Amino acid sequence: MAVNDYEPGSMVITHVQGGGRDIIQYIPARSSYGTPPFVPPGPSPYVGTGMQEYRKLRSTLDKSHSELKKNLKNETLKEVDELKSEAGLPGKAVSANDIRDEKSIVDALMDAKAKSLKAIEDRPANLYTASDFPQKSESMYQSQLLASRKFYGEFLDRHMSELAKAYSADIYKAQIAILKQTSQELENKARSLEAEAQRAAAEVEADYKARKANVEKKVQSELDQAGNALPQLTNPTPEQWLERATQLVTQAIANKKKLQTANNALIAKAPNALEKQKATYNADLLVDEIASLQARLDKLNAETARRKEIARQAAIRAANTYAMPANGSVVATAAGRGLIQVAQGAASLAQAISDAIAVLGRVLASAPSVMAVGFASLTYSSRTAEQWQDQTPDSVRYALGMDAAKLGLPPSVNLNAVAKASGTVDLPMRLTNEARGNTTTLSVVSTDGVSVPKAVPVRMAAYNATTGLYEVTVPSTTAEAPPLILTWTPASPPGNQNPSSTTPVVPKPVPVYEGATLTPVKATPETYPGVITLPEDLIIGFPADSGIKPIYVMFRDPRDVPGAATGKGQPVSGNWLGAASQGEGAPIPSQIADKLRGKTFKNWRDFREQFWIAVANDPELSKQFNPGSLAVMRDGGAPYVRESEQAGGRIKIEIHHKVRIADGGGVYNMGNLVAVTPKRHIEIHKGGK
C-alpha cells in the first residue's frame, strides 16, 4: 500500500450519561491495513510523515479534550438538572428533604460515571497502561516508528484510540470530582437546613407552650378589647351586663370557629413540615380558646337562666301576693297589683263593715238564723282589660283584711299556740262574697256551724328582715298552682330591731290598683237558705313585739270560686295526649268541651275531676289509656305520664291555663286550657307563660 493511500480516522465526542461508552472516541478510517510496502535497510521512511499525522490528529484530540474540560462543571450540573426534571423534583430545593432528594440524583449520577470510568479502565490495554500516557504517547509513538520500520498508520490509529480513552477517563474523573463536591455541598446544605428547621421548630414549640399556658389571659384580653370597642353602658343592670357579655362571647366563639376552618385548610396545604407544625399548634390553641369561651358562655347562660328563674319566681310570687298595710284599717287588695281603691275613701269602707256587723248583730239578737249583710260591691274596670280577658269581677283575685276582733275573735285566745297546732278558732261572723252579674257583693255572714262553719284556720305571720314585711304563705290546694303570699307593711320595724345598731329595711308603700273599685253599700240583711259557699279566710296572728292586732283575712282565688265552663275546645284525632309534651300542649277535645260547657262547678278541683271522668267515658279517647290510668280517671284523677315526662313527685297529666288567671285568663274557659306533662308544664312557666 502506498503512503498516500492512508486515510486518518475521525474524532467523535459523545455525551452519554454513564452509559459505559467513551466520551471522546477515535474512529479509525479502516479496520485493515493490508501488507505494508517493502522498506529497504536504513532509516524508516515513514517517521517524518507519521509524526506529522500524529501531531495533526493529536492537536484535534487535545482541543476536543480542552473544550470539554472548560465547560465540564456546567455540563455536568446540567445533566443533574435534567435528571431532577425527569424525577419530578423542584428546580430549586427549599427544604432539607428536597435537597436530599437532589443529592440522591447527584450520587446516582456519580455512581454511573464511576461505572463508565471502570468500563474504560477494564478494557484490554494496548498502550494505555498508565495515567501519564498522554504525556508519553508522542515519544512512544516515535520510538515505535523508528524501531519497527513499519507503516505508521496502524501505530497512529492505536495511539489516537488510546489517547481518546485516556482523555475520556480524565473527563469522567473530573465529573466524579465535581459530583462528589456537589454531593458534599448538598449534604452540608441539608444538614444546615435541618439544624435551622430544628431551631425553628424548637422556637415554634416554645411559643406554642407559652401561648397554651396563657390561653385564659389571651381570651380575656380579646374579650376586653372587643368590649371596649362597643358603646359603653351607663350603670348597667346585672341583666344588661350579662346580655352584653353573652353577645361578646358568642361572637368571639363564631370568630374563633372561622379561624379554625381557615387553619384546618392550612394544615392540609402546608408547604413544609414547619408550617404544618405551626398550623397544628394553632389548631390545638384554637380548640383551647374555644373551650375557654364555651366555658364562659356556659357560665353566662347558667347565670342568665338563674336570674330568669329568680325573676320568674319573683313574678309568680308578686302575682300571688296580697299586700296590705298593717295600720289597723280595713283594706282590700288585688293579688300582684295593689290596694283596691274605695269609691268613697277607706274610712267609708270601715264604716260600712261596722254598720253591717251592727245590723247583723241586731238581727241575730231578735231572730237567730243564717243571715248575711252586704257592705260593699266590687266592680271591674273594663277599660283596663285586654280583649282576651274576662271583663268580670270573677277574674280578680283579691283579699280583704280587717280587725279580727270586730268579727268576734275572743281576746284571750293564744293564737300562737293554735297556729302551731294547725288549729282553728270559732267566729260568730265571717265574710263572704257572691258574683251577681257584673258586680261582686261582699257581705258579713253569721255562722251556725252547719250551713256556715264557725271554724277559721289560724296562721302566724313572721317578720322577713330582707323585705321588712310580715308574711304568711298559704299553700295552694291545686298542685300546679303557686302558693299565696299575704304581706303586711308595718309602720315601724319590730321591737327587736334596734335602729341605732342596724339600718332597718324600709319597705315600699303598697301601690293602688285602678282596675277594680270597692263601693260601700247600705247594710241590708238577707236570709241565706242552704249552704253558703265561703271563700278562703284566715285569722292572722303577729309577734307580740310587732304592735299589730290579729287580722281576719278573706281572700278569693278564682280557682276556688264556682263558675260555669265556657269555650269550644278543638277537634282532635290520633294520639291526643301526644301533644302534651310539646309546644303549648294538647287542646281540650271539642267533644269533651261539648259535654262540660254550660255546667257550673263549685271550684277548679271539681272541674278537673269532671273533665277526666268525661275523658275516661269517651269511647274514642278512652282507648288511648291503659287500665291503670283509666281506673284513676274514672275516680276524677289525671292519667299517668311516662317517666321521662315526670318532674319530681309530679307524675300525672296537668291542665295549664294558657293566659294566666292572674292576667285575666278564664278559669273555666276551655279555650284557655291545655293538657300538658309535668315536664312541659315547668318548661312553659320557665318561658314566662
UniProtKB/Swiss-Prot annotation:
Task: Write the signal peptide boundaries.
Answer: none
Is this entry keyworded S-adenosyl-L-methionine?
Answer: no
Where, by residue number, does Zn(2+) bind? H656, H681, H685
Q: Which GO terms describe its biological process?
A: cytolysis; defense response to bacterium; killing of cells of another organism
Which InterPro entries does the UniProt entry name for this protein? Colicin/pyocin_DNase_dom_sf, His-Me_finger_sf, HNH_nuc, Pyocin_killer, Pyosin/cloacin_T_dom, Pyosin/cloacin_T_dom_sf
What keywords were assigned to this record?
A: Antibiotic, Antimicrobial, Bacteriocin, Endonuclease, Hydrolase, Metal-binding, Nuclease, Zinc
Q: Which Gene3D superfamilies match?
A: Colicin/pyocin, DNase domain (3.90.540.10)
Recorded E.C. number(s)? 3.1.-.-
Q: What else is known?
A: Pyocins contain N-terminal receptor-binding domain, translocation domain and C-terminal DNase domain.
Instruction: Provide the family line.
Output: Belongs to the colicin/pyosin nuclease family.
User: Can you state the subunit structure given in the record?
Assistant: Purified pyocin S2 makes up a complex of the two (large and small) proteins. The large protein, but not the pyocin complex, shows in vitro DNase activity.
Functional note? Causes breakdown of chromosomal DNA as well as complete inhibition of lipid synthesis in sensitive cells.
Specify the protein name.
Pyocin-S2
Q: Which organism is it from?
A: Pseudomonas aeruginosa (strain ATCC 15692 / DSM 22644 / CIP 104116 / JCM 14847 / LMG 12228 / 1C / PRS 101 / PAO1)
Give the taxonomic lineage as stored in the record.
Answer: Bacteria, Pseudomonadati, Pseudomonadota, Gammaproteobacteria, Pseudomonadales
